[in-house]
């Protein structure tokens, strides 16, 4: 890691570097753009480019100082069309007061004032310059500065501040957005000093599978006492007694269904038989005489 070009107060701690490495923020793509070469540390034998996490931290601090210089936090727009970054930008907006566009960017949001989604931000921050190309293109039309999380192969056209990091992994994206939000709050004074840890865990910025969240919600909403009473008791509303031979209330317990009830005579089926019908042949002969 190259020596930091920052004042000593902004130097990264060993914990910060360990978090960047644990989230694999240094793992770049196999392709390398010419404008991303200054942020390259080395290339592995398998062709994967390794980014310099020292440069990543310097750009995080620079971006945070730019964000903190804007008086109204609502004038900052954070954008992520990539699913892995949508949760991160929403949390960043909630903690810093910025506007979030998570999902598809509506064309004309920065240039067409007739649309309902029209915005006039003073700064935009995008998760991936490739997937958020429409937002960067419109920002260039109206002179909006752009901060972007750039991988080794990301296009840097119209990007003013590039934060070199892995922008395809959910842990890397969440970690960089979390560090950026923490640094902004430190510069604003929301976090008292740099020795005070932020009470928000980095896991809150990580992408979570919607199906996994739905399963966890079902587990949390499960009715209490299922283990004690049994599933059948919960569904039927009656406790499971385990005695299937017990008769329900209001009905006598009988041994065999073939046994006659006590005090009642067996029915005589011959006595109730219907009377014999007339001769069908004679009836038909009378009808034919007409």
UniProtKB/Swiss-Prot annotation:
GO terms for molecular function: structural constituent of ribosome. One of its GO terms (biological process) is ribosomal small subunit assembly. Its main location: cytoplasm. PROSITE patterns: RIBOSOMAL_S2_2. Pfam families: Ribosomal_S2. Keywords: Cytoplasm, Ribonucleoprotein, Ribosomal protein. Residues 257-271 have a biased composition (Low complexity). Disulfide bonds: none annotated. It is found in: Cytoplasm. InterPro entries: Ribosomal_uS2, Ribosomal_uS2_CS, Ribosomal_uS2_euk, Ribosomal_uS2_euk/arc, Ribosomal_uS2_flav_dom_sf. Residues 243-271 are annotated as: Disordered. Belongs to the universal ribosomal protein uS2 family. Component of the small ribosomal subunit (SSU). Mature N.crassa ribosomes consist of a small (40S) and a large (60S) subunit. The 40S small subunit contains 1 molecule of ribosomal RNA (18S rRNA) and at least 32 different proteins. The large 60S subunit contains 3 rRNA molecules (26S, 5.8S and 5S rRNA) and at least 42 different proteins. Interacts with rps21. HAMAP family: Ribosomal_S2_euk. Component of the ribosome, a large ribonucleoprotein complex responsible for the synthesis of proteins in the cell. The small ribosomal subunit (SSU) binds messenger RNAs (mRNAs) and translates the encoded message by selecting cognate aminoacyl-transfer RNA (tRNA) molecules. The large subunit (LSU) contains the ribosomal catalytic site termed the peptidyl transferase center (PTC), which catalyzes the formation of peptide bonds, thereby polymerizing the amino acids delivered by tRNAs into a polypeptide chain. This is Small ribosomal subunit protein uS11. The lineage of its organism: Eukaryota, Fungi, Dikarya, Ascomycota, Pezizomycotina. The gene is rps-0.
């Amino acid at each position: 890691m190259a020596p930091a070009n920052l004042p000593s107060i902004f130097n990264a701690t060993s914990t910060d570097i360990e978090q960047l490495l644990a989230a694999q923020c240094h793992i770049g793509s196999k392709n390398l753009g010419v404008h991303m070469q200054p942020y390259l540390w080395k290339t592995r034998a398998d062709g994967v480019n390794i980014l310099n996490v020292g440069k990543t931290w310097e750009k995080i601090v620079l971006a945070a100082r730019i964000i903190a210089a804007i008086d109204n936090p609502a004038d900052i727009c954070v954008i992520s069309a990539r699913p892995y970054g949508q949760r991160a930008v929403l949390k960043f907006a909630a903690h810093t007061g910025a506007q979030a566009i998570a999902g598809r960017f509506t064309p004309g949001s920065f240039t067409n004032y007739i649309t309902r989604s029209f915005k006039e931000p003073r700064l935009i921050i995008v998760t991936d310059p490739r997937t958020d190309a429409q937002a960067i293109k419109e920002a260039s039309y109206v002179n909006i500065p752009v901060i972007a999380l750039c991988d080794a192969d990301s296009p840097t056209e119209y990007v003013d501040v590039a934060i070199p990091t892995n922008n395809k992994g959910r842990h890397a994206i969440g970690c960089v957005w979390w560090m950026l939000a923490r640094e902004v709050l430190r510069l604003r004074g929301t976090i008292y000093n740099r020795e005070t840890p932020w009470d928000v865990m980095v896991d809150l910025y990580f992408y979570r599978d919607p199906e996994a969240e739905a399963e966890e919600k079902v587990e949390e909403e499960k009715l209490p006492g299922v283990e004690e009473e049994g599933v059948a008791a919960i569904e039927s509303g009656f406790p499971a007694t385990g005695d299937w031979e017990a008769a329900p209330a209001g009905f006598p317990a009988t041994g065999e269904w073939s046994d006659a009830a006590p005090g009642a005579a067996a029915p005589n089926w011959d006595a109730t038989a219907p009377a014999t019908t007339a001769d069908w042949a004679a009836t038909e002969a009378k009808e034919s005489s007409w």
